[in-house]
A protein has these predicted regions:
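Aromatic-acidic/polar surface patches that form glycan- and anion
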Residues: 14, 84, 119-120
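Short, contiguous strand/loop micro-motifs
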Residues: 9-12, 77-79
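N-terminal/domain-start alpha-helical segments
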Residues: 1-8
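Residue-level signal for short segments within beta-strands and strand-turn junctions
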Residues: 2, 71, 131-132
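C-terminal lobe and adjacent flexible extensions of AdoMet/dcAdoMet transferase-like proteins
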Residues: 88-133
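A short glycine-rich, Lys/Arg-flanked "PGG" loop and its adjoining helix->strand segment in the class I
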Residues: 14-34
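SAM-dependent methyltransferase
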Residues: 32-94
Length: 133
């Protein structure tokens, strides 16, 4: 979640794309079913920035970085990566705005630590559990 693309000139706070994605997820759920959504944590990005927040836009919650991608022959090209990060409160409010009933948000490291049951600044991701009424 939060990987829908770079900054949009017509969406200065970077909400429209993510709101439309979560609205689509809501429509795909049958009533009574649950949504489990993983998103990157703004708190983690800020806490672990090593003093350099130049690549993190505080207004949009978006981190920009450039990486190299190699084709099958080994030729490398530069590629921009834009990652939107969220606070637990933002995820909760976005779920409510999409018509979901948020149940919990917790801090996790995908593939490593799904047992966490609280929020902290040391896990890279947030996990939202919500239900479609």
């Amino acid at each position: 979640f939060g990987l829908q693309g770079g900054p949009a000139a017509l969406d200065p706070v970077n909400l429209v794309g993510d709101q439309s994605v979560i609205a689509g997820m809501t429509r795909a759920l049958k009533p009574g079913c649950r949504l489990l959504l993983a998103a990157f944590s703004s708190y983690f990005q800020i806490t672990h920035a090593d003093g350099d927040l130049s690549e993190f836009d505080l207004m949009t919650g978006t981190r920009h970085e450039v990486t190299g991608i190699k084709d099958p022959t080994g030729y490398e090209i530069a590629a921009d990566l834009w990652t939107t990060c969220f606070t637990p409160r933002e995820l909760w409010l976005m779920a409510q705005a999409a018509g979901l009933e948020p149940l919990t948000v917790r801090s996790v490291h995908s593939g490593e630590d799904w047992a966490a049951d609280s929020l902290d600044v040391d896990h890279a991701e947030l996990l939202l559990l919500a239900r479609r009424p």
